[in-house]
Amino acid sequence: MSEKHPGPLVVEGKLTDAERMKLESNYLRGTIAEDLNDGLTGGFKGDNFLLIRFHGMYQQDDRDIRAERAEQKLEPRHAMLLRCRLPGGVITTKQWQAIDKFAGENTIYGSIRLTNRQTFQFHGILKKNVKPVHQMLHSVGLDALATANDMNRNVLCTSNPYESQLHAEAYEWAKKISEHLLPRTRAYAEIWLDQEKVATTDEEPILGQTYLPRKFKTTVVIPPQNDIDLHANDMNFVAIAENGKLVGFNLLVGGGLSIEHGNKKTYARTASEFGYLPLEHTLAVAEAVVTTQRDWGNRTDRKNAKTKYTLERVGVETFKAEVERRAGIKFEPIRPYEFTGRGDRIGWVKGIDDNWHLTLFIENGRILDYPGRPLKTGLLEIAKIHKGDFRITANQNLIIAGVPESEKAKIEKIAKESGLMNAVTPQRENSMACVSFPTCPLAMAEAERFLPSFIDNIDNLMAKHGVSDEHIVMRVTGCPNGCGRAMLAEVGLVGKAPGRYNLHLGGNRIGTRIPRMYKENITESEILASLDELIGRWAKEREVGEGFGDFTVRAGIIRPVLDPARDLWD
């Protein structure tokens, strides 16, 4: 990134209403407890509509039936999405059995949704079941605290089951960072777990009384895999190992993908390298980055409030120097690292500890019993007999981890009988979508429900041009907020309106380049026509090992985005 002429450290002006809401919330309590007892509405009112996000929930409604209910003079069918806090995506089989039961008995849709932030979501929780879901999670050692809104969200960690010691060390740091940056308010325990109010005054030494200016995302990355897409995140710790043992981290700050259609003050941005730090400084540095963003982030405009905008406003070197000052360290030069891929290796792999790990492809992360493919039941049966754990990946897949040789055949039999090991193409394995319709209130176009048939068409194009054994990193996101991480794909579709998308090209396979808009507001048939031509050219003209995104740049089909704060919209 180029060093912009430094602007003010703090943006003066009228604060957003979200800042008022946080300040008046009494450390995130609001009147949520009273609202829970209001049976006249299925939703939360006023500030509570937003405050519940700090408790891991979003209020949604079924948009497929919204108009019909309005005609009947009924309020929307309100239901909550709940997102679990699950650092590194590791979940025990006992915990899995509990969430399977809750999803089946207490949600409208009956499904478990794995997300690309290495956790699971329940969709369709009615208000009467909101308190029970938090209590169920607590009973098995889980919670939903700080998985949404202006806090440090679920901390990601590379799903690396092969190098077991390195993964274990990195995973422990992901958990430590998550715990260190959690809010200290007792509001969650008081409201959901019926814990008594104590006489002490709440304090938030790291997050502050009004918490962060905007959402904040953190990762721990183990090269050469970039499965967690570090450039989508505010703060990234890239593991540096010597002889298979973790010795420290490279720190990268200021990634983020959310944009707003037509608003050139918004942009996706890759993270900036700050330097290397030994392990013992990890928590101090994490706290310093968060508190610098807390104090310098823009609280007058939520569309310009994320860390990426703070870095561009004050300058990377200024922000870095402040982190060094607060953490009491000087960063060492970045240690060498490289990424070679970010997809999951589907199927069995043997770890260096001689245990086996089975990565299951879960299309769109949606776990449900389908006709002839009882995925949810199959995973429950595996959870009942498996002695290791499950690991949710940042590609919305699931790893059955730590399987001894003696148990391998038994688990494989259940997986195959349940449709969990059905063969899929490389293209389908490397495609992803966010949830979008019918539950997401921000959705502009279909994503999860659109992707399977769209990939059928892409598979046909790949076969037509003789590249069925290849893949293109392809992602669909239903709106420009970018949950599907389309703005780090080789081919990214960003929802614009029902049935219409902006087509972005020119990202790369390893997720280190932002794609540029190639065509705007086009239909599926127009997208397929464009890709038919371009895949054909790639098949004929590519260099050895050249990915589709790199080809589109080299062939002059699309100009690479070099400095997105300045040239993304050119």
Swiss-Prot record:
Protein name (Swiss-Prot/TrEMBL): Sulfite reductase [NADPH] hemoprotein beta-component
The organism's place on the tree of life at top rank: Bacteria
Pathway membership, UniProt: Sulfur metabolism; hydrogen sulfide biosynthesis; hydrogen sulfide from sulfite (NADPH route): step 1/1
Residues reported in the UniProt entry to bind [4Fe-4S] cluster: 434, 440, 479, 483
Gene: cysI
Keywords per UniProt: 4Fe-4S, Amino-acid biosynthesis, Cysteine biosynthesis, Heme, Iron, Iron-sulfur, Metal-binding, NADP, Oxidoreductase
Source organism of this protein record: Escherichia coli O127:H6 (strain E2348/69 / EPEC)
Function: Component of the sulfite reductase complex that catalyzes the 6-electron reduction of sulfite to sulfide. This is one of several activities required for the biosynthesis of L-cysteine from sulfate.
Any GO BP: hydrogen sulfide biosynthetic process
GO cellular component: sulfite reductase complex (NADPH)
Enzyme class per UniProt: oxidoreductase
Positions bound to siroheme: 483
SUPFAM superfamilies: Nitrite and sulphite reductase 4Fe-4S domain-like, Nitrite/Sulfite reductase N-terminal domain-like
Family per record: Belongs to the nitrite and sulfite reductase 4Fe-4S domain family.
Keyword Amino-acid biosynthesis: yes
E.C. code: 1.8.1.2
Cofactor binding notes: Binds 1 siroheme per subunit. Binds 1 [4Fe-4S] cluster per subunit.
Signal sequence region: none
Swiss-Prot/TrEMBL catalytic activity: hydrogen sulfide + 3 NADP(+) + 3 H2O = sulfite + 3 NADPH + 4 H(+)
